[in-house]
């Protein structure tokens, strides 16, 4: 069975991506990163999801990006914008986050002898991050094969982004087909310690709209529904 490293945040998209990789016959090795994000409940969700989907191994890395990057996701003094107030790249953008995450996944893939990395980015229903686009994924894959021993020896690495062209409602439908319980996932940028979502940020809006478009009841725990 081929090995794959799957970046798992604990959110809806990364959980669906893990289920897709598993469904495609990969032995999945999950990688979650604590980069100082304020929505730490997402990492607790990642733990539960990794166990439920029976990953072969689950690594948690601590990498404090708060000293390098000012973002609403890492700096409590920066307000998480309410949906609809963003212009251009939002305050929730964490500089180079996906590049850092993919680089860590790449390093572990080399150690494992894996040629496959999965990431749950989408360029359809997203907040405008530059590192969620198809040309970015293609560029990283090219770099990975130029910069690694595996690539130089002809064992080419593939960065899989199976959700890249899917709207949120199709992602949700695909995940449900694979048996995902989305109530276990946390997407909110400012979820509380129990994982209850604010219902106002971009992530909450996109998630809520996705379930509505899929005509499926939203199982998310919202703070205003307590």
From Swiss-Prot:
Protein keywords: ATP-binding, Ligase, Metal-binding, Nucleotide-binding, Queuosine biosynthesis, Zinc
Any one GO molecular-function label of the UniProt entry: zinc ion binding
What is the required cofactor set for this protein?
Answer: Zn(2+)
Residues that coordinate or bind ATP? 8-18
EC no.? 6.3.4.20
Give binding positions for Zn(2+): 188, 198, 201, 204
Q: Which NCBIfam families match?
A: 7-cyano-7-deazaguanine synthase QueC
Q: Which PANTHER family match?
A: 7-CYANO-7-DEAZAGUANINE SYNTHASE (PTHR42914:SF1)
- State the protein's name: 7-cyano-7-deazaguanine synthase
Source species taxonomy? Bacteria, Pseudomonadati, Pseudomonadota, Betaproteobacteria, Nitrosomonadales
Q: Which gene encodes it?
A: queC
């Amino acid at each position: 069975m081929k090995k794959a490293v799957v970046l798992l945040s604990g959110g809806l998209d990364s959980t669906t991506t893990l289920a897709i990789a598993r469904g495609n016959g990969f032995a999945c090795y999950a990688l979650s990163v604590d980069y100082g994000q304020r929505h730490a409940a997402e990492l607790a969700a990642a733990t539960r999801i990794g166990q439920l989907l029976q990953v072969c191994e689950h690594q948690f890395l601590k990498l404090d990006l708060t000293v390098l990057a000012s973002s609403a996701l890492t700096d409590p003094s920066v307000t998480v914008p309410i949906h609809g107030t963003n212009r251009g790249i939002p305050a929730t953008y964490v500089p180079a986050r996906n590049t850092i995450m993919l680089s860590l996944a790449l390093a572990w893939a080399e150690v494992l002898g894996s040629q496959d990395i999965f990431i749950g980015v989408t360029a359809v229903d997203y907040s405008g991050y530059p590192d969620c686009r198809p040309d970015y994924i293609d560029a990283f894959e090219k770099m990975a094969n130029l910069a690694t021993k595996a690539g130089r020896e002809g064992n080419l690495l593939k960065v899989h982004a199976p959700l890249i062209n899917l709207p949120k409602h199709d992602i949700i439908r695909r995940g449900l087909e694979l048996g995902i319980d989305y109530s276990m996932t946390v997407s909110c940028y400012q979820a509380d310690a129990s994982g209850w979502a604010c219902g106002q940020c971009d992530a909450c809006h996109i998630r809520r709209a996705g379930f509505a478009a899929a005509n499926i009841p939203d199982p998310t725990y919202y703070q205003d529904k307590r």
